Amino acid sequence: METTSFGFAASLLFVGVPTIFLIGLFVSTSDGEKSSFYSDTSKGRLSPEPKK
């Protein structure tokens, strides 16, 4: 019983952690692209010289 529960937890961690990491990475990347795009176009905070 202990071995199977450990194996279940290990497989759950092995599958769940990369999935959550990939989802979080995808969300943060898309959100970062959006925010950087908006801040770059409206305020130009990312670039030292404003492009106009």
Swiss-Prot record:
Intracellular or extracellular location(s)? Cellular thylakoid membrane
Q: Where is this region: Disordered?
A: 31-52
Supply one GO BP term: photosynthesis, light reaction
Give yes or no: UniProt keyword Magnesium: no
Membrane-crossing segments per the record = 6-26
Q: Which residues form the signal peptide?
A: none
Which residue stretches does the UniProt record annotate as biased composition, category Basic and acidic residues?
42-52
Q: Which InterPro entries match?
A: PSII_PsbM, PSII_PsbM_sf
Which UniProt keywords are given for this protein, alphabetically ordered?
Membrane, Photosynthesis, Photosystem II, Reaction center, Thylakoid, Transmembrane, Transmembrane helix
One GO cellular component term, please give it.
Answer: plasma membrane-derived thylakoid membrane
Q: Would the keyword Nucleotide-binding turn up in this protein's UniProt record?
A: no
The entry assigns this protein to a family as follows: Belongs to the PsbM family.
Q: What does this protein do?
A: One of the components of the core complex of photosystem II (PSII). PSII is a light-driven water:plastoquinone oxidoreductase that uses light energy to abstract electrons from H(2)O, generating O(2) and a proton gradient subsequently used for ATP formation. It consists of a core antenna complex that captures photons, and an electron transfer chain that converts photonic excitation into a charge separation. This subunit is found at the monomer-monomer interface.
Q: Return the protein name.
A: Photosystem II reaction center protein M
Species source reads: Prochlorococcus marinus (strain NATL2A)
